[in-house]
Amino acid sequence: MDKFLNNRWAVKIIALLFALLLYVAVNSNQAPTPKKPGESFFPTSTTDEATLTDIPVKAYYDDENYVVTGVPQTVNVTIKGSTSAVKKARQTKNFEIYADMEHLKTGTHKVELKAKNVSDGLTISINPSVTTVTIQERTTKSFPVEVEYYNKSKMKKGYSPEQPIVSPKNVQITGSKNVIDNISLVKASVNLENADETIEKEAKVTVYDKDGNALPVDVEPSVIKITVPVTSPSKKVPFKIERTGSLPDGVSIANIESSPSEVTVYGSQDVLDSLEFIDGVSLDLSKINKDSDIEADIPLPDGVKKISPSKVTLHIEVDSEADQKFENVPIKTVGLSSSQNIEFLDPESQAIDVTAKGSPTNINKLKKSDIELYVNVSDLEDGEHSVKLEVNGPQNVTWSLGRKNAKIKLTSKKSNTSTNDNSSNTSGNQDTDKQTNDQKNNQQEDTKNTDKNNNDQNQDGNKDQNQDQDEDESTANSQSSSE
């Protein structure tokens, strides 16, 4: 017995038997797991499976000469393998799905999608595994870019966009010939909401077919710079020509036409509402001795931001000078108070002779009724006054008056009616009342004619001004205001 125990092989065998007995004893308390046919009795590593979605597809082809359509952007991939390998693949996605078309020519082909860089121990299935592609020759063409505004109705009140400035104006579009031929619109969009000043932005270029569908093409550059000038509220107004200097002897103005006859002014709405016309368009008559085209600057009124155009052309036609005398032109009254009477002391006839000078054409058309001779008695108190004689009439005519001033007497209507009882004074008062009514009517007519003359087609708003002369014999020349 001692000899048996001293044998080392015997001890090893006994130890192995005890180990087997211990293993059986430990596992005897657990329900046995049924084994599949062919499965080893000893434990093995577990397997797993997962489906990954939206895996990108890489296309390999000659992209310098060809364009390929039909390759899906993404696919679904199912991976199988050990739990650790599947877990790692799900996290890293370090494999690649691709379509190899480098050996294919133009036309339609069925291409198998493949995977590479797959870890050992993994199997991969791709859905879809086959795709139909079309290969066409690559074409590049230049197209202009159109700018589309949106939210234009939401701009600040009175503001509006002008023509956009695009840089670059054209882009290079590359794609298959069929797609290039179907291009209907190349545009970039600009949002105008709340705009009240010039907009500068970069915008993406999008390409559409005739049905409004975006096309899969390459655009170079894909982003362009757009500048949109934004204008403030505006309105068109006429302008008045202010004549300075004197025409050379024997020369008269036959006609003046302006091009354009109106200009556009830009500014706040309050400024525009108060602006009816523009003054100060100057014309120097001393420099005119023949038919001429003169460029004149339009002055910028207070509060106006811009005028367009800033210059106008005045086309001036000249002629020889003719004259005509009109006798006993009646003097009308402007600005007479309803509580006053007026009496002309000198001239007592309330009329003087007037000589008109101008081109033969204008003088031949002139009638006595065209001449508006008047005195302005606004704000004058009762008593005797020497008031200036003024004249309005057709444009391009100058006037010579027999005198500079008229002597008048203003009286209150109340004092006249309370102190005069005899028939001659009563008759005189009736005549005065009649004269006053006539003068009131003349005042209204003069005011109307003055407004009419201030809005002539050349917008020449200069009122005739009489030159100082001797009261009895001197002659006053004034330039007529335009109708």
Swiss-Prot record:
Lineage: Bacteria, Bacillati, Bacillota, Bacilli, Bacillales
Alphabetical GO biological process terms: positive regulation of adenylate cyclase activity
Transmembrane helix recorded as keyword: yes
Cystines in this chain: none
GO cellular component, one term: plasma membrane
This protein's name: CdaA regulatory protein CdaR
Keywords linked to the UniProt accession: Cell membrane, Membrane, Repeat, Transmembrane, Transmembrane helix
Listed Low complexity bias regions: 413-430
Cited Gene3D superfamilies: 2.170.120.30, YbbR-like domain
Disruption phenotype: No visible phenotype.
Biological role stated in the UniProt entry: Upon coexpression in E.coli stimulates the diadenylate cyclase activity of CdaA about 20-fold. In B.subtilis c-di-AMP is a second messenger that mediates growth, DNA repair and cell wall homeostasis; it is toxic when present in excess.
Compositional bias ranges of the Basic and acidic residues kind: 431-454
Subcellular location field: Cell membrane
Transmembrane segments: 9-26
Region (Disordered): 410-483
Record note on quaternary structure: Interacts with CdaA.
Domain YbbR-like: 55-135, 143-228, 237-316, 329-394
Induction data: Constitutively expressed, part of the cdaA-cdaR-glmM-glmS operon.
Annotated membrane topology: Single-pass membrane protein
